[in-house]
Amino acid sequence: MRNTKLLVVIDESEASKRAVSYVAGIIGRGRRFKVCLAHTLPEIPAHLIEHGGAEDPGDEEKLERELHSDQNQWIVAARKKAQPFLAGARTVLRKAGLPAGSIEERYCDPAEGRARGDEILEMARERECHTIVVGSESLSRWRQLLGDDPVEELLRRGKGFTVWVVE
């Protein structure tokens, strides 16, 4: 029998904590399970999306480099802020009996022009996770960001995946 790998999407919400607890309760001491914790970082602030531009190509290039550097610094800070949430989720899974080597951590960085649902599905494919677990409160934030229902998007585009939505 092959290992079963779950992608558990987390953020700072209570729903994410419930999703992790639910997964811990379901798979507990199961040795054939692996979990990929994927922390979804918030969208990059508007002031870091683009600059005002410049007439001189050299100045434009410099502004682009600075903007890219500022975006990278913002992502590094957001990842650092997310570390306690990942550590907490890891602790819950470990206390339930999941071996440390069966848990990995990833970040779902904000991608320019891509829907969050697409990013999650791509990560699930790359990590070979066949089940995606999300908390419902975190989905409310996604609805605001995406302007539509990410659960429906995950279900519509996620052919071949099982999606667990934890209330």
PLM region descriptions:
Residues T91-T131:
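Structural beta-alpha unit
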Residues E64-V76, I103-E105:
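Short glycine/proline- and acidic residue-enriched helix-loop micro-motifs
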Residues V8-I10, L37-H39, R106, V134-G135, ...:
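Conserved beta-strand segments of the P-loop GTPase G domain that flank and frequently precede/overlap
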Residues M1-D70:
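Small/aliphatic-rich secondary-structure junction motif
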Residues L6, V23, L93, I120, ...:
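Hydrophobic structural packing positions in well-ordered secondary structure
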Residues L121-E167:
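Gly/Ser-rich helix-loop-strand patches that form or flank binding pockets
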Residues S16, G113, Q144-G147:
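A conditional alpha-helix N-cap/helix-loop micro-motif detector
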Residues Q73-G88:
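Low-complexity, serine/threonine/proline-enriched polar segments
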